[in-house]
């Protein structure tokens, strides 16, 4: 629980200690996954937001032709199928553990009740959603950029730690290139 507490204290320094403790008590769902296990399934409604304590994850979208990595989760990050979590509609994605993992989760109902009751947290939640929208715009720019070199460089500049945590084949899928192309770009 200490990593989650430190994470929340850093993100919401204005949240009083009593309210932080109330919020931490709502993070009461622990999950342990083995490599290859799914955190959520396509078609299910995502009811939990998780904080990754250990392990790494990939968020995937599947078409008839291919599996596309659209995001990652790793220690110290929040993880959920955002469209399903926010809308309450069935997921179009699945989340898979790349490495054995431990998470702690908060149920959507509990989170939104806390947002309604706590002005400081509501302000934080709004800012978090704004940051997520801006990150999505950056991701769209990544996908609109024609050059694999540019896509690689943008990710390297924005999130260099991803290259230490995530296998190349998943990063390549995320960048919409072959693993061989990614390997060549990394050698330059």
Model-predicted segments: where are they?
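Cyclic nucleotide-binding regulatory module and flanking cytosolic helices
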Residues: 1-30
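Short phosphate-coordinating micro-motif centered on Lys-Gly-acidic
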Residues: 39-44
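Glycine- and acidic-residue-biased ligand/ion/polar-headgroup-sensing regions
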Residues: 47-58, 75-76
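Basic, amphipathic alpha-helical hairpins
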Residues: 115-118, 136, 158-163
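Phosphate-/nucleic-acid-contacting segments
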Residues: 146-188
